[in-house]
From Swiss-Prot:
Species lineage: Eukaryota, Metazoa, Chordata, Cephalochordata, Leptocardii
Coarse class of the protein's main subcellular location: cytoplasm
Organism per entry: Branchiostoma belcheri (Amphioxus)
Name used for this protein in its record: Translationally-controlled tumor protein homolog
Protein role: Involved in calcium binding and microtubule stabilization.
Similarity section: Belongs to the TCTP family.
Amino acid sequence: MIIYKDIVSGDEMFSDAYKMKVLDDYFYELEGKITTEKGGIDESAIGGNASAEDAVEGLEESGTTGCNIVIAQRLQETQFTKAQYKVYIKDYSKKVLEYLTKNKPERVDGFKAASAAGMKRVMGNFKNWQFFTGEKMDQDGMVALMDYREDGKTPYMLFFKDGLEEEKF
C-alpha cells in the first residue's frame, strides 16, 4: 500500500486504495463515494448484565456521513473566499517549488507549466469546491478540493500532485 503525505504538514492525505488518475499533470483526482461510518457505543464496554436490568434502554447509534476519503483520512473542512484562496495557493506553490528544487529538480519545469491550467480549473469552478486540510489542520499545508460529478452524488477530490510524497507500507 502507498500512503500519500503532504510535504509541508506531513499529514496523510490519502492512499492508493482509491480510484485515482493524474489530471493536468498537476492534480491527483480521486473518486470517492458517500458512506456512513458508524460511531456507536459498544454495549459490551459498558458492563453490567443487560438481561438483569428492569428497563433496557436502547442506545442510539451515531455516525458520520460524508465522502469516504474525507472520513477515512480524517480530513478537516475549511473555508476560503476567492481572494483568500489566491493568497493561500501562491504561498503553498512557493513551498512546493522549494521542495521540488531541492528534492525533485526534474519536476520544477513541469510544475510551473501545469500550474496555470490547474489554477484555471480551480478558479473557473470556485463556488462549487469544498476545501479540506489534513488532520492536523496546518494552515500552511495542502488544501484538497472536493466537488461532485454531474450526477450530483459522486464526490471527487483533487490533491496537488507535486505537494505529496509517497510512503510505501
